[in-house]
């Protein structure tokens, strides 16, 4: 695990917007490296992004019905990002990164 300091509880202290913005940082890195043909760097960023999604799901507060819908949305994002990354679909990755931009704006 590359984010051990976050798995010790620091991630749970962040707001969902902060968590999603951090996921966005790694997804942008993965996309950038993939576009440059640096598959090794792209895969490391992709793995870090997956870890952050895992932490969001593990530490999420998804007890209410509206939060359960959000959990589904996060899982669907992961599914779409994984497919786009494995297919090297830069157009789809860009669209998914744009989705995450909205969380960075909330956080700012």
Descriptions of predicted regions:
Residues 1-108:
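Surface-exposed peri-terminal alpha-helical interaction modules
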């Amino acid at each position: 695990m590359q984010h051990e300091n976050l798995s010790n509880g620091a991630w749970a202290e962040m707001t969902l917007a902060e968590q999603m913005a951090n996921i966005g940082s790694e997804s942008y890195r993965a996309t950038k490296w993939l576009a440059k043909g640096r598959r090794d760097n792209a895969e490391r960023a992709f793995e870090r992004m997956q870890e952050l999604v895992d932490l969001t799901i593990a530490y999420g507060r998804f007890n209410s019905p509206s939060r359960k819908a959000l959990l589904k949305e996060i899982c669907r994002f992961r599914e779409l990002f994984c497919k786009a990354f494995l297919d090297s679909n830069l157009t789809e990755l860009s669209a998914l990164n744009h989705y995450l931009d909205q969380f960075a704006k909330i956080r700012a």
